[in-house]
Amino acid sequence: MSDLEKLKQTEPKTWAAGLPAVISSMQYIFREAGPLRGGNGLLEMNQKGGFDCPSCAWPDPDGHRSVAEFCENGAKALASEATRKLAGGEFFARHSVEELKGESDHWHELQGRIEQPMILREGASHYQPISWEEAFQLIASHLKKLPSPDAAIFYTSGRASNEAAFLYQLFARSFGTNNLPDCSNMCHESSGLAMKQSVGVGKGTVTMDDFLEADVILCVGQNPGTNHPRMLTTLEEAVKRGAKIISINPLREAGLMGFAHPQHITAMLGHRTKLASHFLTVRVNGDLALFRGLAKVLLENGGPDLDLAFIQEHTQDFHVYQNLVEGISWDEIIRMSGVTEVEIRELAGLLASGSRKVITCWAMGLTQHRNAVATIREVVNVHLLLGAIGKAGAGLCPVRGHSNVQGDRTMGIFEQMPEWFLAALDRECGIQSPRKHGHDTVASILAMHRDEAKVFFALGGNFLQATPDTNFTAQALQKCELTCHVSTKLNRSHLVTGRTALILPCLGRSELDGDSRFVTCENSMGIVQPSCGSLSPASHHLLSEVEIIARLAEATLGKNGAVPWRWLSEDYDRIRELIERVVPGFENFNHRLDEEGGFYLPNSAKARKWDTPEGKAVFSTAPMDVFQSAEGRLVLQTLRSHDQFNTTIYGMDDRYRGISNARRIIFLNPEDMLVRNIRPGQSVDITSYWKNETREAKGFLAIPYEIPAGSAAAYFPEANVLVPIGSQAEGSGTPTSKAVEISILSSNTD
C-alpha cells in the first residue's frame, strides 16, 4: 500500500483534549503497560510524594492536585516507560543492526524496554549482551586512551534528574573537559541567552499564580495543545478569570481555539472553552517585526501606555531604543511580520489597557531562527515598556519541552559554566575543573566530523534524530571510536554508531530505585520537587542513571581520587548535600524537600533585581529583519505531530491537524500548491538551500493547509535531514529548524 493510500485526512480540529484525549490515553496505557501497572502509575504521576512526569516541564499546582494530574502526552510517556515488552539478548540476536535501520522510529518505540547492557563490537552485525562491569571497563579504557579529555563528548537529555546531572558534569570536569552539550542547545538556548542579556536571568519569571492574575497572555510560536497539554488547564482558568489569550503563530492550532477539560463532565458532554480571542497569523520569522510594531504603537501613545516610573528606575538604553523604533516605517513592519497595522494597533491597545499585566509565553517558534536571540530580546523590550515584569500577573514564560532540562542546566550541564560555579565545584569536590569552554551540540557534531572527538557518551536522548542535518550527523557519529547511550528503549541513535557501540539500560522515572532513594527535578517555573518511582523495574539488570555515572567515573578515574563516586551513589542525600554547597538557592536541600510540593528557587528578575553588568534591565537595539527565501522558494519549519514527544513517536496520527497514518507529509499553502501545479496528496521531493549547499528529502505527501503563503511545515525528525548544520541562531548556536529555505518538485515516482 502506498503512502497516499495509507493517508487519511479530515478537517483540522477546532478544539483539543476532551473525550478523544481520554480514549487515546487509556488505549495506549492498556496496550503497553496494562490496566494494573499503567493505572497505578497514573495515580502516582505528578502527585506530591509520587514521581515527576517524564514528558514536558509544565509545573504541577502548588496546592490541590487532582487525582488525574496528567495529560494525554504524559499518559503516553508513562505507558512507553512502563511497557511490559522487553528487548533483550534474544531480540537483538533476531534482528541485525541493518535490519533495525530499515524500521521506522515508531516501530523502534514499540519494541519495549532494553533489558540488559548490549554491545555492538567492531565489525559485528548484531548487538550482544555484555556485563555491566565489562561495559564500564571498556568505556574507561577508551577514555583513558584519548589524546586529550576534549576528545570526549558528554551529551545530556533533559530527562536526567538533578542528582544524575550534577554527578555527570562532575565526572566530565574531573576527567578534564567542559564538552557538555545538551538538548537545550537545540531548543531554548536562545531564550536563556536573550533573557540573561536583557534581565539578568535565563529562566522564566512567572509562576502558575501569575496566570490567574494576568490581563493578557500571549502564546507565541508554540502549540500547547500538543506540546504542553496541561498548560491548557491553566489557560482555561485564566480565561474564566477574565484574561484574554492571544495566539501569535503561522498556524492556527486547535489547542488555542478551544479546550474540553477531560476531567469535567460538561466538557465530556460537549462544552468547550474558547481560549484565544485573537489569532495573529504571523509569517515565519516575522515575530521580531511584530513586537517592534507593538513597541512603535506604545511609544507613539506615550505616557498612558508606558510604565515611565519603571523605565526610569529599572532600565537602561530606553532613549536609544525609542529612537530606533521611531525610525522604522509601518511598511517595513507589515512586510516583515505579515500582520496588518490594524491588528498590531488593536493588540497594543490590549497590552496597555488596565494594569498592564501581561505574560508572554513562547517556544520553538521563536528560538530556532537565526535572529532568535534578537527576537526574544524584542519580546522583553515590550515588557520593559509596559513594566510587565517582576509584578503579579506579568512576566516572561519560555515554555520548556523536557521535564528536567532547566534543572540540568542549573546543575552545571553547560559547556561554559561561569567561574563562580567552577570555583565552588573545585572547592567543594577537590577537583580542578578546566576553564576552556567546551562544545555545544552543533560544535560537538562538527568536532566528531573533523575526527577531533572520538568518544561520544549520551545520558539519555536520541541524539541522531534530535539534531540537525541528519546525514552529516550520522557521518560524524560513525567516525567515533566508541558511542555509548544510556537509554530505556531502542532508538535510531543505537543503529548509527562508532566502531564500537554500547547501550546501557537505565531505570525510568516511574520505577523504584532501591528501598528509599528518590531524585529531584526542576520544572519550567523554577520549582524543585522530589520524584519517587513506585513501579517495579522492567528488568533486574537495570541500573539508575546515578549508579551508571558513578561506576563509570570510578572505572575511569579510580577509587582513590578526590570524589567518592560509589559512596555518593549509595545515598542520593549525599549528592544533594554536595549540590547545596555548590549551587546557590539549594541551601538545606534535603530538609526543604520535606516541604509539600517542593520549593521555589530564587529568581532575581522576578524581584526586580537585575543581574546584568549594568545592574538594570537593558533595552536591546537589534536591527529588524526577517528570513527571506529566494524567488520561487518557500520557508520550511519543522514541528511535532500530536502522537509524538520530541523524537519519540507514539503513533502515526496528528489528530488535531486532521492527519492519520502518515508522517512524511509537508503542509503547504493552497495557493503555493496551485502555482506549482501540485495537487493534494501528491508525492513531492524537497530540496533545502544553505549558501552553496543543497540537501534533499524525497517522497513527502503535499497537504493543503491554512498556513501563510510562502511558508511550509513538516514533521521532525523526518525533515531534520533538510536543516543545515551551518545555519544557527546568532549567539546561541541553536539550529534554525524553523527557517529552512526549500523548493519542492513532483517526485519522479508520482
Where are the regions that the model predicts?
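Short cysteine-rich clusters marking metal-coordination/redox-active sites
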Residues: 50-56
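Intrinsically disordered, low-structural-confidence terminal and linker regions
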Residues: 1-50
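Low-complexity, highly charged intrinsically disordered N-terminal segments
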Residues: 79-126
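Cofactor-pocket helix-loop regions in the catalytic cores of large enzyme subunits
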Residues: 2-22, 112-400, 426-606, 661-698
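C-terminal structured "cap/appendage" subdomains that terminate the fold
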Residues: 674-732
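Glycine-rich loop/turn
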Residues: 103, 107-121, 637-665
